[in-house]
Amino acid sequence: MTTHVTLEDALSNVDLLEELPLPDQQPCIEPPPSSIMYQANFDTNFEDRNAFVTGIARYIEQATVHSSMNEMLEEGHEYAVMLYTWRSCSRAIPQVKCNEQPNRVEIYEKTVEVLEPEVTKLMKFMYFQRKAIERFCSEVKRLCHAERRKDFVSEAYLLTLGKFINMFAVLDELKNMKCSVKNDHSAYKRAAQFLRKMADPQSIQESQNLSMFLANHNRITQCLHQQLEVIPGYEELLADIVNICVDYYENKMYLTPSEKHMLLKVMGFGLYLMDGNVSNIYKLDAKKRINLSKIDKFFKQLQVVPLFGDMQIELARYIETSAHYEENKSKWTCTQSSISPQYNICEQMVQIRDDHIRFISELARYSNSEVVTGSGLDSQKSDEEYRELFDLALRGLQLLSKWSAHVMEVYSWKLVHPTDKFCNKDCPGTAEEYERATRYNYTSEEKFAFVEVIAMIKGLQVLMGRMESVFNQAIRNTIYAALQDFAQVTLREPLRQAVRKKKNVLISVLQAIRKTICDWEGGREPPNDPCLRGEKDPKGGFDIKVPRRAVGPSSTQLYMVRTMLESLIADKSGSKKTLRSSLDGPIVLAIEDFHKQSFFFTHLLNISEALQQCCDLSQLWFREFFLELTMGRRIQFPIEMSMPWILTDHILETKEPSMMEYVLYPLDLYNDSAYYALTKFKKQFLYDEIEAEVNLCFDQFVYKLADQIFAYYKAMAGSVLLDKRFRAECKNYGVIIPYPPSNRYETLLKQRHVQLLGRSIDLNRLITQRISAAMYKSLDQAISRFESEDLTSIVELEWLLEINRLTHRLLCKHMTLDSFDAMFREANHNVSAPYGRITLHVFWELNFDFLPNYCYNGSTNRFVRTAIPFTQEPQRDKPANIQPYYLYGSKPLNIAYSHIYSSYRNFVGPPHFKTICRLLGYQGIAVVMEELLKIVESLLQGTILQYVKTLIEVMPKICRLPRHEYGSPGILEFFHHQLKDIIEYAELKTDVFQSLREVGNAILFCLLIEQALSQEEVCDLLHAAPFQNILPRVYIKEGERLEVRMKRLEAKYAPLHLVPLIERLGTPQQIAIAREGDLLTKERLCCGLSMFEVILTRIRSYLQDPIWRGPPPTNGVMHVDECVEFHRLWSAMQFVYCIPVGTNEFTAEQCFGDGLNWAGCSIIVLLGQQRRFDLFDFCYHLLKVQRQDGKDEIIKNVPLKKMADRIRKYQILNNEVFAILNKYMKSVETDSSTVEHVRCFQPPIHQSLATTC
């Protein structure tokens, strides 16, 4: 039956879909984010102690004492935070320079107003330390009373007293360290006295006491020592405290790093307090009351421990400052200067990695079954399975604590032992102390080890955090089962024996334990239990069903049970005989074992908080102690001295592939520090400083990482495209061009929501933004590099663009970039403009360098730079100095590609023209051609026209071709004489030839561009053929039909035929575009379009001036001997440059190349004077005669034979030029007119006949 759903319900259900988490398969390479849920803390600080009326009254009273002492410890921590985070106020307040200063009253009033709240805090601190010392000493006095010395004192109580000792040590060191506290109080006191704020004697006395308290070093320690020494037997209690710390430390009865370090500090400070005028620790050691050798071993293994924040303490200092140290110096090894292996983190890494792999493997096995398959919370497990998960959680926390402690211990040791310029050559002599302790105090291996350990800690924290709910279930089940089994089952036998033997005290304790903790099946203890009567169980046994629940005990409940159990096995008791002696050996062992195991119950019941504390590395950032040492010179240290950034930057600078995936873990230290600043220190200004540093560091991080990623993929593209034969040849000569080492940037590029200071950062997006900018800059620099060089560098430009194209393709696999064509158009300034920077520079180079300075060689089909430049070298902008990765990817690749493209530098030939075609495209080529035509037009109608007019004037009016009988020497002499004015014309071999060379080079450029364009179009057509159903004819065997094979081939390639596909699937607009593209591709070569024809036709239109063709012939047909047409002038010019030059002179071809001939021949062909030129050319006539008579003489310093040879060369060249030009011009002529115009002339009549007629 279908249910009716309203529209509102349906819409609300759709809205709920937004709340569903959508995993994006992002690789986890960062620590877990801080939970936005509350952490439940069930520690009541014994507020519910009165509820346990069934417990032993004495321990309930002790819980009351514990409660008040814990409150005092919390207050002491607040004062420690106050001292540690104290920043000098007096330095920020303007100082009164002299008593005559007019605004001194106002300054003093403001000083008092600002400092009074702070001084009040200091006053409260002084009163607190007095009260704390009095409270501690009163407890010691009570416990050391003659009648109480044999009383049982619980371990928890002794540890609380130990925490007090630790508190005193920390507060005293902080007070000693903070000079700014004393300075602020002095400033306040000075201002208050001036304003007479402290008029009454009590205020003056309090202020004096505070001054003395702050001024005297170790004041708290001295007061504590003095008050303890008047208490008889105080050393016995302190010995118990020290011994419990030794026992806990030796048996690793601690979980968090702070607990471990607290035990060591209590040992050291406890020994210092015990050793004095009244007591001697060495005598206590002799009596076996304490074990100094064991403590010495601990202190030697761990010489330095964190005291508070970045303050450290050398444990040996407690020993060295004790009263009887000098005479017992030889007993201590920890005071000798030696480095413990504990501080060599690199050597420890083998064991750390092994532990990590072993534990991760085991955790993964449970994680896969519990979390991945979803069977964790729903399935009911056995006690053994819960116990395994319980043990796994405990081992994980202990491992995390061990690694975190190790990191902090190495860091602490480094802070106490800063390097110097003698130990580290990189350390400058002017480096600050904090800089020497952090920036220069670690080797590269140590930094990598730090990063790896931090990554292990944070990575394991993530894995354990995912299983937190599973662990919580297992922990509560295991603790509940352990407590109930122990209380309801294990304690039955000792209770039975106690009842039988009538041990009333023992019975009361055992019953109190059971009543405190037992959760009976029926809600009450079975009244028929034989053990309650001291009887044996029946033969069938007495069945006790212990229930199973996921409920842990309260903190007070667990304390009561553990304390009462401890009282059973303690060596001390209020009576002469201990309760331990009343218990059997196995029971004692069972109680001891349970007591030891239950130590960690409190931590595990708060696994979330314990996990956070075991992974807390926040102190790696705090530096208040070292800031205090700068005496106001520093407000804050730069990021180069900050440990989190030092580690992050080291990974980025070294580009170590194995560490790249760890790069986000050091940044999480800022998360730890920020969390600690807000929740533990509760100081907003510290958080603000952390946030400011994070903003700077993360910008630097993204900047450096983006540059590295771009450089990596650029080098990869450059290596892929580098010619393999070139690489092999280099290898043969011993030059290795390396491929970029594989790096793990892909994982970083998948990070879409990096958590940092509560922000969710899309790292991929930020990197994409910077890489887009880098890609644009790379293209921009490639074009700028081309703009700073001549036309020959266009081949290099194309390869730079190809490398950038491949780089773009590689990067697009991991990020969303704009299309390469769009980026290229933007860099080329070709988005809205009709032509881009490349087109402009090509034309600029053609106009100012190529046309005037290059010589064409028809044999090699290349242009080379002229031997004698007639124009100045154009001024180009120098290329900017840029990073290697903006070119080919790296320095070796830049050198390699520079060597390859150096072979294209000294000429302009087919490779360059093909590149120009590909880069400029039809539109760019059209623009360049149009501009070249303008240049040709200005030359032909300007400079050249003026020279032609001038030269026609100096030509002989009539110059007949001499008869063969004159011989070649005579003909040479005749022409030399006739053309004397032309030969001696000063500007002919310079400006005239130069202008003609420019025209010729322009014509040649257009011709060669068309040839290159035709090749590119053929290539395009062949590539497009399979998609246009243009298939090659197939070879067929005898007997096979061509139609059948072709149809089969067409059917095979039918899916590739683009137009029918788009017609079937595309939109009308797409269909129209596909048809137009198909038509253009098929027809652009088939219709025989020729650009060069149009160029020549346009040039012909520039030759309209009458001077080119001369006046109409007098005979009505043609000019024969008259020198009035251009071809006669060109014959004269040809005669000039065919004259051989001297030994050290440059020939015309060296100076002007074939472009000179191309210009002349092109003008002749376009004027229709080619045949006349061939008939009436002076040089050709001389060559014919010389070939017949074969004479070789020197006529007017001109060697005849050499000149004839030169004429023959130019004749061949002219014929080639004419053939090429005619090939293009004839198609124009045949198109324009299919009828040949023939003019009919009357036959010639002899003169004699004409007269008679």
Curated annotation (Swiss-Prot):
One of its GO terms (biological process) is cell-cell adhesion. Pfam families: CYRIA-B_Rac1-bd, FragX_IP. Its main location: cytoplasm. Keywords: Acetylation, Apoptosis, Cell adhesion, Cytoplasm, Nucleus, Synapse, Synaptosome. It comes from the Eukaryota. The modification N6-acetyllysine is found at residue 1037. GO terms for cellular component: cytoplasm; neuron projection; nucleus; perinuclear region of cytoplasm; synapse. The keyword Transmembrane does not apply. The keyword Cytoplasm applies. Transmembrane segments: none annotated. It is found in: Cytoplasm; Nucleus; Cytoplasm, Perinuclear region; Synapse, Synaptosome. GO terms for molecular function: small GTPase binding. InterPro entries: CYRIA/CYRIB_Rac1-bd, Cytoplasmic_FMR1-int. Involved in T-cell adhesion and p53-dependent induction of apoptosis. Does not bind RNA. As component of the WAVE1 complex, required for BDNF-NTRK2 endocytic trafficking and signaling from early endosomes. Component of the WAVE1 complex composed of ABI2, CYFIP2, BRK1, NCKAP1 and WASF1/WAVE1. Interacts with RAC1 (activated form) which causes the complex to dissociate, releasing activated WASF1. The complex can also be activated by NCK1. Interacts with SHANK3; the interaction mediates the association of SHANK3 with the WAVE1 complex. Interacts with FMR1; the interaction occurs in a RNA-dependent manner. Interacts with FXR1 and FXR2. Interacts with TMEM108 (via N-terminus); the interaction associates TMEM108 with the WAVE1 complex. Belongs to the CYFIP family. This is Cytoplasmic FMR1-interacting protein 2. The lineage of its organism: Eukaryota, Metazoa, Chordata, Craniata, Vertebrata. The gene is CYFIP2.
